Amino acid sequence: MFLLPLPAAGRVVVRRLAVRRFGSRSLSTADMTKGLVLGIYSKEKEDDVPQFTSAGENFDKLLAGKLRETLNISGPPLKAGKTRTFYGLHQDFPSVVLVGLGKKAAGIDEQENWHEGKENIRAAVAAGCRQIQDLELSSVEVDPCGDAQAAAEGAVLGLYEYDDLKQKKKMAVSAKLYGSGDQEAWQKGVLFASGQNLARQLMETPANEMTPTRFAEIIEKNLKSASSKTEVHIRPKSWIEEQAMGSFLSVAKGSDEPPVFLEIHYKGSPNANEPPLVFVGKGITFDSGGISIKASANMDLMRADMGGAATICSAIVSAAKLNLPINIIGLAPLCENMPSGKANKPGDVVRAKNGKTIQVDNTDAEGRLILADALCYAHTFNPKVILNAATLTGAMDVALGSGATGVFTNSSWLWNKLFEASIETGDRVWRMPLFEHYTRQVVDCQLADVNNIGKYRSAGACTAAAFLKEFVTHPKWAHLDIAGVMTNKDEVPYLRKGMTGRPTRTLIEFLLRFSQDNA
């Protein structure tokens, strides 16, 4: 990922939450093995009584009103996303966590560009499940809260934390739907969230563990276990050379770790000759910046510079699990960007697969170099759509932060499909410009056909997209710059601090809707 020189599903663990706890503590610790998360809505009017969800009402009736009675004396009404824990109310559930869902009527917010009700459910359920885990209970049953898919996503995303390499593990918590509600929607939510968690795990794993070869092997294992309608090709350096991918090879040559070109196929369409959608993901498994080396502070985060490859591959694995009736191909050029005597030097000129020459004025703008060859190769499949994802520019983080993925596309149809999918998932996208204004800044090049950085410091995300456009002739292409959404501090309440796996769920939703539209 090129950073502008500006003036900086596994086991689970949670932090202690500031919650109120009420009820009898007479049950022994040995009895406390299962928890329950129930939702309650905010008051619509000042004089209203906060309303339980349907599951909450039924549970309160089972207790002859004791849940409501205990809630009324426990403090002020619960705000959205807040939790309150009660003990000893029911023998099957020694701990019951009430979670605030906000207003029941919450729907699509046209300013926020998401479904507020679904986001409230995800955040509330995540907080409730973390509280159950914090109590060291091994299982939790979850109120569907009116949307079982959103509830499942909140539970599975909220409970995930990467601790694979720690000796001391926190207790894993299994979550399931409370009652006999919409199991199909719940399982769909589990699938969507598990797809994102796969991307999170790939992105979080240290670079000495997550090499290009290891990444490819993990995706191969996951894809083959997801469906029999799949093919995986782990292409070695010799194949990359045969394909004349000189731009990709120029980045890889600085590292002793061999490059891999991962090519995955999901053949879900009943028509084997149906043109596929092609997803392309940047797969830099560690980005030091090369000779244009990065500052050491936070360089460790560049283990996730393969986030584009992680998200597109995880989305395809999820599509295979959903058995979608479409054909999809995933392409991921995988390598490290390291400094050495063999590495690219500023001012070098390399040749891409389509014959265009590239002046490499900044070796830290390497993602676009490997994507250039992959995008050229993507055209050989006669695709319906080409979509690439990449943690491409620090400028994208400056522009949008973690609020949304930046989308550059030559197709309003494709933009609308991605935008609609993002409203559903809450993992938002925002359209960015592909003006000729930016193209001129990369094709005005002294030594080659195109420069890998723009003439000016401004609009770095836009000039990076303009560079990629030089290797695209397809009329339905989108470039997703995910640099700003790569990590989470506390912005997304149902994701812990760390790598996010965004926007995997939006890509899955896009594929699902595309398959339905083309049925």
UniProtKB/Swiss-Prot annotation:
Cofactor binding notes: Binds two metal ions per subunit. Two metal binding sites with different affinities are located in the enzyme active site and can be occupied in vitro by different metals: site 1 is occupied by Zn(2+), Mn(2+), Mg(2+) or Co(2+), while the tight binding site 2 can be occupied by only Zn(2+) or Co(2+). One Zn(2+) ion is tightly bound to site 2 and essential for enzyme activity in vivo, while site 1 can be occupied by different metals to give different enzymatic activities. Mn(2+) is required for Cys-Gly hydrolysis activity.
Residues reported in the UniProt entry to bind Zn(2+) 3: L202, M203, T205, R303
List of residues binding Mg(2+): D287, D364, E366
Binding residues for substrate: K282, D287, S292, K294, D305, D364
Catalytic class of the enzyme: hydrolase
One GO term describing the cellular component: cytoplasm
UniProt: Zn(2+) 2 binding residues: K282, D287, D305, E366
Modified residues (N6-acetyllysine): K221, K455, K489
Residue positions where Phosphoserine is found in the record: S42, S54, S180, S194, S238
Location(s), subcellular: Cytoplasm
SUPFAM superfamilies the record matches: Macro domain-like, Zn-dependent exopeptidases
A biological-process GO annotation: proteolysis
Binding site for Zn(2+) 1: D287, D364, E366
Subunit structure: Homohexamer.
Membership in a protein family: Belongs to the peptidase M17 family.
Role played: Cytosolic metallopeptidase that catalyzes the removal of unsubstituted N-terminal hydrophobic amino acids from various peptides. The presence of Zn(2+) ions is essential for the peptidase activity, and the association with other cofactors can modulate the substrate spectificity of the enzyme. For instance, in the presence of Mn(2+), it displays a specific Cys-Gly hydrolyzing activity of Cys-Gly-S-conjugates. Involved in the metabolism of glutathione and in the degradation of glutathione S-conjugates, which may play a role in the control of the cell redox status.
Protein name: Cytosol aminopeptidase
Provenance organism: Homo sapiens
